[in-house]
Amino acid sequence: LATSILSYIKTNETHSNWIICEGGDDKIYLDTILPENKEYRILPVGGCGNVVKLFNLLLNPLLIDKKERKEFKGKILCIIDTDETKMNYKFENLKDMPISLRRLQVFKSNNEEVIKLLDVAKQGTIYEKTEIEDCLDPQIYYNSIKTVILSSQDSNIIDLFNNFELNREKKFSKISGDDSLLLPNGNEAYRRKNELVSFLEKPEIKMLVAKEYSQESQSTNITHALAIEIIDYFEESMITVS
């Protein structure tokens, strides 16, 4: 797979930009939030471990052979979640490489929520569990989970969800934790919130929500902060390899 991607990027006449992501639901979100006039090839590979493996397989030939880099006609962005368990990644100097491994991170800067794609080799002090579902438009995501939950025929989850309301002060779509998109109405809802989070984290539910989000987004004209981060990465200039 790595050989095929490298070969395609080198032989394609126009710039070929690739995004390697974890899962099929990630691909749906990326297809949804990125503008149609930006042509990205988005490839889900089934989990963080596979993204990192493919990154290494793509990186090694570029580290070894300058000619390989010189023939590159595009860039590759590998995106992973920030998991609860902090991982330590060590890479050689990747400055001006046409490939990068970044982790999603939502955090507060000057009391404002921001999204960054942080280089995993430069961990820094900012580290909080983040996945793509935390980086979306809050109103559209709320509408999407509401539609999926009400269609689920799970009366316990429906009753529980009806005891929450949208936190309109949120800039993004994080559900878990106290700083959440969902505001509980009463102690029982607060106490049982993890049941709702667990339901929404089921793979089949995540996929349904992603598809619903894509549908909901068609009638809006919103620029997603994550999309801006991704576009900025691909538009950053690199020093030409001589």
Predicted regions and their residues:
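Nucleic-acid enzyme cleavage-core boundary/entry regions
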Residues: L1-S16, K27, D179-S242
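RecA-like P-loop NTPase motor core
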Residues: L1-T85
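Generic structural signal for hydrophobic core residues of well-folded globular domains
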Residues: I33, Q139-I140, S144, V148-I149, ...
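Activity-critical C-terminal alpha-helical subdomain
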Residues: G74-E201
